[in-house]
């Protein structure tokens, strides 16, 4: 049984490819999801993707992952700077996670520099564009522990 990865994308990431392409690039979220799934499969893992613009929906999906997922890759979008609820959900389920950002948040507005997730993440990927998803999926597939079988 291969590792199971949950890919979560937060608010406005459904607009990737058309939203500020000079910052976020031209790759769409469906393209990112398709390539992430294919890469996970090539490494013997499975990947499920979830996107929501709503904080509570993301919290619910993280809670549903408890006991069913080996690792989470999360691009929290703007919730990076505001969501204690998503942070608490990630800590409550005790699933290691990678925090991912398409743009280099540290080269942008000062308020984007703070993250509620970075101090608890197993790793942080910033500024690599859509390629960052491949790096994150590969790291989870090759380095995270597989959950114990029942």
Curated annotation (Swiss-Prot):
As its record notes, the protein acts as a catalyst of: 3-dehydroquinate = 3-dehydroshikimate + H2O
Provide a GO biological process annotation.
quinate catabolic process
Task: Name the keywords, alphabetized.
Answer: Lyase, Quinate metabolism
Signal sequence extent: none
Entry keyword annotation includes Cell inner membrane: no
The entry's substrate-binding residues are 75, 81, 88, 102-103, 112
Q: InterPro entries this protein is in?
A: DHquinase_II, DHquinase_II_CS, DHquinase_II_sf
Q: Which GO terms describe its molecular function?
A: 3-dehydroquinate dehydratase activity
UniProt cross-references to CDD domains, sorted A to Z: DHQase_II
The pathway to which it is assigned is: Aromatic compound metabolism; 3,4-dihydroxybenzoate biosynthesis; 3,4-dihydroxybenzoate from 3-dehydroquinate: step 1/2
The Enzyme Commission number assigned here is 4.2.1.10
- Residue numbers for the site described as Transition state stabilizer? 19
> What are the positions of the active site?
24, 101
Subunit record text: Homododecamer. Adopts a ring-like structure, composed of an arrangement of two hexameric rings stacked on top of one another.
Q: Which HAMAP family match?
A: AroQ (MF_00169)
Family in the record: Belongs to the type-II 3-dehydroquinase family.
Give a short account of what the protein does. Is involved in the catabolism of quinate. Allows the utilization of quinate as carbon source via the beta-ketoadipate pathway.
Name by which UniProt lists this protein:
Catabolic 3-dehydroquinase
